[in-house]
Curated annotation (Swiss-Prot):
Keywords: Chromatin regulator, Chromosome, Cytoplasm, DNA-binding, Isopeptide bond, Metal-binding, Methylation, Methyltransferase, Nucleus, Phosphoprotein, Repressor, S-adenosyl-L-methionine, Transcription, Transcription regulation, Transferase, Ubl conjugation, Zinc, Zinc-finger. S-adenosyl-L-methionine binds at D637, G638, I639, A640, T641, E660, D682, V683, R684, R887, S888, W889. The active site is at C706. This is DNA (cytosine-5)-methyltransferase 3A. One of its GO terms (cellular component) is nuclear matrix.
Amino acid sequence: MPSSGPGDTSISSLEREDDRKEGEEQEENRGKEERQEPSATARKVGRPGRKRKHPPVESSDTPKDPAVTTKSQPTAQDSGPSDLLPNGDLEKRSEPQPEEGSPAAGQKGGAPAEGEGTETPPEASRAVENGCCVTKEGRGASAGEGKEQKQTNIESMKMEGSRGRLRGGLGWESSLRQRPMPRLTFQAGDPYYISKRKRDEWLARWKREAEKKAKVIAVMNAVEESQASGESQKVEEASPPAVQQPTDPASPTVATTPEPVGADAGDKNATKAADDEPEYEDGRGFGIGELVWGKLRGFSWWPGRIVSWWMTGRSRAAEGTRWVMWFGDGKFSVVCVEKLMPLSSFCSAFHQATYNKQPMYRKAIYEVLQVASSRAGKLFPACHDSDESDTGKAVEVQNKQMIEWALGGFQPSGPKGLEPPEEEKNPYKEVYTDMWVEPEAAAYAPPPPAKKPRKSTTEKPKVKEIIDERTRERLVYEVRQKCRNIEDICISCGSLNVTLEHPLFIGGMCQNCKNCFLECAYQYDDDGYQSYCTICCGGREVLMCGNNNCCRCFCVECVDLLVGPGAAQAAIKEDPWNCYMCGHKGTYGLLRRREDWPSRLQMFFANNHDQEFDPPKVYPPVPAEKRKPIRVLSLFDGIATGLLVLKDLGIQVDRYIASEVCEDSITVGMVRHQGKIMYVGDVRSVTQKHIQEWGPFDLVIGGSPCNDLSIVNPARKGLYEGTGRLFFEFYRLLHDARPKEGDDRPFFWLFENVVAMGVSDKRDISRFLESNPVMIDAKEVSAAHRARYFWGNLPGMNRPLASTVNDKLELQECLEHGRIAKFSKVRTITTRSNSIKQGKDQHFPVFMNEKEDILWCTEMERVFGFPVHYTDVSNMSRLARQRLLGRSWSVPVIRHLFAPLKEYFACV
């Protein structure tokens, strides 16, 4: 069979007819050989990146006359299996499976098995050039000619792969086949950076699609039922035969338009289909009721249970995703199936370090293993009737036994024993934690308790209360009915184990919520707002205050519960919305702001003493004639903020030894202090011998890197890994620099780090330093928010922070001439460039020449209290200078802490 190129279009019709007749026998023989070859060969040839569905092969049920379509006159009657698409591609349509024994039975979709694109008739070349298989025969051809036409179409499709590789070689723009559309990916779940408006749009679109699909299914069901009743006069549940499926648009036996259905029947069927439509039927597993492990960003693998969308009160999950109800807190999330594992993968998903540190994770493990043991019929010893401390120990022992059972593979039943029973597979069964967890699950609490709750005098409760959103709703309802005092319940979670008062609003707070508040109160997102709700330090959806100088958030759950039903929607419609902390009124339903909340908030962080230490040694002031210059050891020195403040206070500095590894920071210190700083390199290379050689020291200061301590960093490694371990270098050198026994000379030290650190890390630092920290926010003495913890023995660290006349408290005071501040104070400036942007709309803080502008480096230096151009050395870029400032201390705060040292050391 002669091959033809793109230019062989002048051959006459008679010659093409002779060629086809001469090669007909060869093609039939070749077809027999091709049917014996495996169909996988066809998949390996041609363009790998594009999957094409070949024209369907006629079966015995379809008419024998081929339907031919021309490019200029497409009609409904002449449309064939390969209708022309605008981009020249073949329309992808499903075709009936060829019967056994038909010529195409051995091939998938009628595609050739080998020799693709080797020899092509001239008419096939022209047809493919036009983007469709076209022949010269009309629709009145005989059955024999139909077979020849089929062979010609198959041959034309053979050379499609080789032609496709040539097409577009000079550029996609000159090709008939246009550039494919870019693939759009969709990340399932609710990432924190998706705005509420976009999330609502997605949910509304999913809901519309689900309703539309339900209506179509209802109509099709009605059509099938009417057809079945007309044929057999009885209801048949079997599916209709394959020939009646609308897969072949050219088949005259298929009705393409559904018969009219009554309005009542249509509505009834639509409602029934919307309720009874199967859920999670995408063939990817993880059905309703299954126990799974789920992965969210920033969290370890967490145990959960697959639930129906009906339980969540939201819309259906998209295809390939599942609604998961998490154990421990009972919240819901949409998780893609790639981020799910069965509970039987306990050995690979269970994280021992998280179990040791996080009480909520321990509670979640306890709850899921309770459910697993109940399903598997595995019995564990129950908690005995005793006081609460013994109950907690019994729960601890039981939890350990269940974990060992899970790590052993859930024997003897194995993973099969974890399958949900039939009643839990019902999507409309309300299954909450307190219904499918044994009552002992509520007894679990992280031992030892910080403070024992009050015990009832009438009887000893066997277990603690079950705390969830419904518990808080019930207690708040009792408060509204004047049956309970709001100070007796934790307004954050609903617990009755109140240990202190909420620092901002009238109401109580439990120990767990106190720990969360300590961690999250000063944790901010990239938009400058709090990461969590001001009331409960949680919340799935939060309302952000519209006041530019306020950075607080309130979750919808707390607002609707404490302020009143519908208050959240009213706040959303109000623009701008002033939150309950900066509003004019002090009372909003049950949410009443405390009048003295600023001092209470300060005392909340100052008196959060989980551990009691002996008060630091108090040194009496040194007489003026006996005062000597100070000798300082500065670890993690940065840009020499300590030396700058000592000079500003007029304190004479005898020696300033600094440990720093950043070259830019060292350059700034050397240039601005004229070589008076002795740099000693990495803090890990400093030994006790060096301390004795350089000392004695009167003041040791430092602040280790906070990257692995701040809970803002989801990949943080904690105090004992990464840069967190550098704290122990400070502790080691502080111990070496302390005066010997019998030496009563004044000795002071100061250690600084972020407020947004884990409670356990803060507790460990305090235990090593044998001191509790004080929290100081630079917003009281500067134009920027910057809350930090300070440990030390400096005199008067707890005294109120007072500004001076030289402090620039407003951003406008820090700007150059002709520039207008849009905010009175800026958010915490960090090493990241986007920390300059302010508010939920990410505005730049300065307005100049009718345009928004960023802070200049000189203005940032004024915000931190540094002299103008303090970091302007060695041609450093703006970002490099911002990184230096983002790691530094606030000068007014350090001046406030160092001021009492004037009573002990010589001054100029």
